[in-house]
Amino acid sequence: MSNAQLETAIEAAWEARDTISPATTGETREAIEETLNALDSGALRVAERGADGSWHVNQWAKKAVLLGFRIKDMEAQSGGPQGGGWWDKVDSKFLGWNSGAWEKAGFRAVPSCVVRKSAYIAPGVVLMPSFVNLGAYVDEGTMVDTWATVGSCAQIGKNVHLSGGVGIGGVLEPMQAGPTIIEDNCFIGARSEVVEGCIVREGSVLGMGVFIGQSTKIVDRETGEVMYGEVPPYSVVVAGSMPSKNGVNLYCAVIVKRVDERTRSKTGINELLRD
C-alpha cells in the first residue's frame, strides 16, 4: 500500500480500535503490520522536519504503533540470564537476525541493549546497554550511551550524543500530541531528561542533570527571555533556579551562552568509536 492508503486504513482502524484483536485479519492487520515495518526500516517516520525547520507529525503512524499492541498476544521471549526470558507482545528489532542482517544495518549494538520492533536505527549508530522504544528514530552517527533510554516515537538526529542515563520521553503514556525531538549535532549531558514533546534544536548542548518538560522555564541569561518547550539552536543549557513566591526558588533551565569552539572541543564526536 502507498502511504496515503496506509493512512486511510489506519485511521479507519483507529476508529474501530476496540474491535481489533490478535484474531484480526485482512486489510486492517496488513496496514498495521506494513506501517510498523516501514517505521522499522526508516522508510516512514512518526515526525519529519520540513525545510523551514518545523516538524510535521504523522499522527496516523503513531496510531499504528498503538494499534500494534492490539494484534499480538503476550508470549514468552527467550534470551534472559540463566535461561530466563521475558513476557511481552512486542518483538525485538533483532529477532531472527544473522550476520548478513547486522552488516546491512550498519550500526553497532553492544550486549544488553534493547531495541523494540518498529524503531529505526541508522548506520553508524552505537548502542551501548540502552533502551530504544518502539516507533523511535535514531539517525546516523549517534551514540546512545549506557542506560540511556529513547522513548516511544522519539526522534534523534544525526551525530547526537545521549550520555549515560539520559531519558528522552515517549508519546504513548501519558499520551502526547508530538514526539520528543533532539535535532542534529546535539550533546545531552548525563542523567538529563527531555520529555513531553519538547524540542532541542540543532547543535545545542545540555549540561549534566538538565530536566526539560513543557512546563519547564527555559531562561536566556543574556536577555532574560523565558521560553517553554523548545531549546534554540546552538544553546548551552545548564540547570538553574528562579525566585518564586515567598522566597522559594524553583527549578529552571538556563541558556548560559551559545556554543563556541571550546564547547565543541569538549562535546565532539569521536569518529574512532564509529568505525
Swiss-Prot record:
User: One Pfam family for this entry, by name?
Assistant: Hexapep_2
Q: A GO biological process this protein is involved in?
A: lysine biosynthetic process via diaminopimelate
Keywords, in A-Z order? Acyltransferase, Amino-acid biosynthesis, Cytoplasm, Diaminopimelate biosynthesis, Lysine biosynthesis, Repeat, Transferase
> Reaction(s) catalyzed by this protein?
(S)-2,3,4,5-tetrahydrodipicolinate + succinyl-CoA + H2O = (S)-2-succinylamino-6-oxoheptanedioate + CoA
What EC number(s) is this enzyme filed under? 2.3.1.117
Q: Where does substrate bind?
A: 108, 145
One annotated Gene Ontology cellular component of this protein: cytoplasm
Name one molecular function that GO assigns to this entry. Answer: nucleotidyltransferase activity
Grouped into one coarse class, the protein's main location is: cytoplasm
Instruction: Spell out the subcellular localization from the entry.
Output: Cytoplasm
Pathway assigned to this chain's UniProt record: Amino-acid biosynthesis; L-lysine biosynthesis via DAP pathway; LL-2,6-diaminopimelate from (S)-tetrahydrodipicolinate (succinylase route): step 1/3
The UniProt entry, under NCBIfam families, shows: dapD, PRK11830.1
User: Would you identify the family this protein belongs to, as annotated?
Assistant: Belongs to the transferase hexapeptide repeat family.
In terms of PANTHER family, this protein maps to: 2,3,4,5-TETRAHYDROPYRIDINE-2,6-DICARBOXYLATE N-SUCCINYLTRANSFERASE (PTHR19136:SF52), MOLYBDENUM COFACTOR GUANYLYLTRANSFERASE (PTHR19136)
Name of the protein: 2,3,4,5-tetrahydropyridine-2,6-dicarboxylate N-succinyltransferase
The organism named in the record is: Dinoroseobacter shibae (strain DSM 16493 / NCIMB 14021 / DFL 12)
